[in-house]
């Protein structure tokens, strides 16, 4: 079943058996084990530096023992081109401080019919999935005993379980494929400092990404994230960040609770109809920053920070929902903020310092009570009536492109 490949040639090994002292002058050691036959006996990878499971080879376990267990301090690389399948865990990893790289190649599978696909107990290193990891419980589970673990799910990769990926410790996650939670979350993160970039698809029955307990998570999304309850739930007590880039698509709202320091940043360009709101009164995002080229948010927005908590620092930002801002809105020079998208009517609370351009394109007659200051101009492009009742002291021009009336009572 297993062919071990050595750096020593056959003659050297034979002489070594006759003259053991010869091996003292020969530094080469066992290098790799190749699994080239299928087996229903659970396998333990612990003595060689590298293990390779050939294509079309299947390793199964019908009991609670993992189909393949990787442990000890000698293993540095495991490559699966075949099939690992267990009733218990498919692949168990417990390598402590030893750096380990696990590659699940395209077309390969790691699965469990009752437990977890890849169970990482203790490990530092990389899990690279180009194939399928599927399980009854967690597709991938990372225990709090691990550290410095990086998980890459490539464009051909699938990680699926009741919870797709569940991490109890800080990890780096790079997803270009699909991570799916069939009964709970696509990704569950409960502790540690996590960096997550998504260019693929993350979906869960409850939450796309669920951030809980003491996890601190930084997310950059230019892919798809969705859930039956929320796309993303920030429910930890740490300050989390969400960056939406070109290509981002959210199916469900983004909820913030438990922390007053969560933030949202927009880069690139996009259109989003999700709400970015707090779960309870007083919850929300400490800051929202537009750093991109063109973004439209048609959902509601809860901003709970102070100072310039809503900033339009570049490009064109359109808001078409109810924007509750405890602080101030700042529009910088050469940037623009549009309220309303021609069909929907936006509202904005808090102060508004406009050094660029503020555009009203409301879907109905509207009253705007926010005080406007700054050196920028105000434009109205819709055909409805706009009534300004704030204490306005902006010094820029007021330009009517459409509509019949502009009433200023402030």
Model-derived segments and spans:
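Beta-strand-rich extracellular passenger or scaffold domains
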Residues: 32-258, 263-410
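Gram-negative bacterial Sec-dependent N-terminal signal peptides
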Residues: 1-32
């Amino acid at each position: 079943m297993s062919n071990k490949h050595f750096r020593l040639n056959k003659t050297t090994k034979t002489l070594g058996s006759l003259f053991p002292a010869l091996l003292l002058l020969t530094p080469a050691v066992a290098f790799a084990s190749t699994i080239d036959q299928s087996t229903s006996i659970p396998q333990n990878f612990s003595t060689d530096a590298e293990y390779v499971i050939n294509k079309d080879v299947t390793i199964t376990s019908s009991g609670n023992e993992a189909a393949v267990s990787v442990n000890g301090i000698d293993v540095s690389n495991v490559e699966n081109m075949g099939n690992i399948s267990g009733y218990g865990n498919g692949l168990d990893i417990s390598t402590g401080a030893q750096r380990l790289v696990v590659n699940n190649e395209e077309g390969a599978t790691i699965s469990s019919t009752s437990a977890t696909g890849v169970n990482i107990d203790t490990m530092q290193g990389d899990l690279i999935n180009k194939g399928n990891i599927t399980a009854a419980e967690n597709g991938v589970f990372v225990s709090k005993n691990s550290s410095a673990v990086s998980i890459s799910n490539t464009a051909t990769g699938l990680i699926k379980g009741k919870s797709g990926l569940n991490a109890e410790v800080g990890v780096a996650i790079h997803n270009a494929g699909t991570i799916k939670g069939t009964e709970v979350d696509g990704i569950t993160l409960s502790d540690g400092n996590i960096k997550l970039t998504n260019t693929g698809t993350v979906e869960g029955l409850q939450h796309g990404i669920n951030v809980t307990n003491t996890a601190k998570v930084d997310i950059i999304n230019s892919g798809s994230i969705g859930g039956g309850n929320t796309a993303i739930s920030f429910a930890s007590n740490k300050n989390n960040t969400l960056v939406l880039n070109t290509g981002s698509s959210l199916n469900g709202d983004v909820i913030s609770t438990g922390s007053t320091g969560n933030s949202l940043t927009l880069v690139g360009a996009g259109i989003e109809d999700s709400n970015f709101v707090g779960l309870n009164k007083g919850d929300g995002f400490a800051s929202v920053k537009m750093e991109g080229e063109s973004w439209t948010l048609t959902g509601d927005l809860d901003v709970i920070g102070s100072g310039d908590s809503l900033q339009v620092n570049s490009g064109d930002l359109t808001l078409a929902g109810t924007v509750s801002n405890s602080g101030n809105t700042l529009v910088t020079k050469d940037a623009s903020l549009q309220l309303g998208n021609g069909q929907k009517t936006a509202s904005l609370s808090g102060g508004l310092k406009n050094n660029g351009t503020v555009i009203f394109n409301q879907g109905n007659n509207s009253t705007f009570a926010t005080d406007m200051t700054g050196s920028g101009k105000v434009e109205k492009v819709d055909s409805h009536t706009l009534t300004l009742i704030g204490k306005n002291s902006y010094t820029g021009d007021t330009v009517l492109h459409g509509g019949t009336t502009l009433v200023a009572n402030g």
